[in-house]
From Swiss-Prot:
Pfam families: GidB
Positions with biased composition (Low complexity): 7-21
InterPro entries (alphabetical): rRNA_ssu_MeTfrase_G, SAM-dependent_MTases_sf
Name used for this protein in its record: Ribosomal RNA small subunit methyltransferase G
EC number: 2.1.1.170
Keywords: Cytoplasm, Methyltransferase, rRNA processing, S-adenosyl-L-methionine, Transferase
Organism annotation: Rhodopseudomonas palustris (strain HaA2)
Gene Ontology CC, one term: cytosol
HAMAP family named among the record's database cross-references: 16SrRNA_methyltr_G
Family to which this protein belongs: Belongs to the methyltransferase superfamily. RNA methyltransferase RsmG family.
UniProt keyword annotation of Aminoacyl-tRNA synthetase present: no
Subcellular localization(s) per the UniProt record: Cytoplasm
Binding residues annotated for S-adenosyl-L-methionine, in chain numbering: G85, F90, R155
Renumbered residue ranges of the record's region Disordered: 1-25
Amino acid sequence: MASRHSPQTAAQPDAADKAQALRLTPVSRETETRLDAYLDLLRLWQAKTNLVAPSTLPQLWTRHVADSLQLLALAPTARRWLDFGSGGGFPGIVLACAMAEHDGGHVTLVERNAKKAAFLREALRVTGAPGTVMLADIGDNVDRFPRALDCITARAVAPLHQLIGFAAPLMTEGSKVLFLKGQDVEAELTEATKYWKIEPQLHASLTGGQGWIVELDRIVRHAPSTTNPEAAAHDRH
């Protein structure tokens, strides 16, 4: 009798998970092949570098890949992306795999952990996806980051008001941000409006649960106010 941990039994839930993800967020055969290569590499590295929560490994396609791919529908013409805190590559590597089909497609992946940055570089090499890895903290001098971006992303990196602060200097006419957030999105938006004038669009995650995508296409910092000492202190920093 086969062990419950055998490749045969492990492959079945993975195949079902993949099929469900591709129903939610269809991709071309070429992109699917790149994503397969990426996930094979992730599983290999996961043993020595914690790239994703171990409990989510059986649902890599739905929990992570589809969650990342859904951003493409919200920015269908975007070709130049920047992903803050790329970690294990969600959404950055997934987006890069999709951008390989488009002329001028490119994803800049910003990651402060050297081991994870090394993984991201290897993932770009193995998949042939167009991208660049920057070993940097997302709070570093923004002059280091590329300009002329179409879309800025982040997933499970920092509170919303901080992410907006990191993205604001990189925004140009026609660009947008897409931040993947969880069940506390309303509280985070309330906090963010203390510091920023924003008109967010909220999109429920296609992958279910309590996930949300915050879409912003304009960010303006509130002027320092003596009636809002907390915002004024934030502005000084």
